[in-house]
Amino acid sequence: MGTYSNDQSRILKIVEDIFGSNQINSTMKKMFICLMALCTLTVTAVSAQKMDQTAKNLKFYGHVWDVVVNEGRVDMLDTAFAENVVLHTTPLVTGKANAKAYFANYVTGFSNRQFIVRESLAQGNKVVKYWNFKGKHTGTFFGIPATNKDVDVIGCTIATIVNGKITEERDFMDMLEFLQQLGIMPR
């Protein structure tokens, strides 16, 4: 260790002899400023990259549910869902095939479907959407025969998106209100 300090001192002495101590201080300051600028640019670039991915996740997620619900194309979930997707519902739904079957109930159970995202936000790999679902119950919905009643419910979903795939969803809505609108539960 002592040798290292001695060598370091000798190198500094040689550089001072060549350039003068004022030049070293000036050069060190310039190097420090350049290093700080480089660090700042790197942090800014990484932050911009993360913000760009967050914006992509938000756009992707909105597009998926517009296509699935409004256009009735449940096949979109083949590319949008991760193979091991988890839907935190009652009961818990796991796997892409089961998740597709779950959402197919909404497409086959309701005509005149409208899925409107009222507000959405994202941070990192999480997307949150506040939504409104409207439709007429004209088909079988999770075993419930058509009631020909209109529904208009609001809810919120928290989703996780990893590598461009939806890996997890948690939906929250007033199920009592939904069942009352279907005429299944009394008001």
Listing of model-derived features with the role each one plays in the protein:
Residues 1-51:
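Bacterial Sec-dependent N-terminal signal peptides
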Residues 52-59, 74-127:
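A solvent-exposed, acidic/Ser-Thr-rich amphipathic alpha-helical stretch
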Residues 77, 124, 159-166:
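Short, solvent-exposed coil/turn segments at beta-strand boundaries
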Residues 91, 121, 133-135, 173:
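A mature extracytoplasmic/lumenal domain signature
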Residues 125-137:
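A short hydrophobic beta-strand element
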Residues 135-163:
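Exposed beta-sheet edge and beta->alpha loop/turn motif
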Residues 167-187:
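Low-complexity, intrinsically disordered terminal/linker segments enriched in charged
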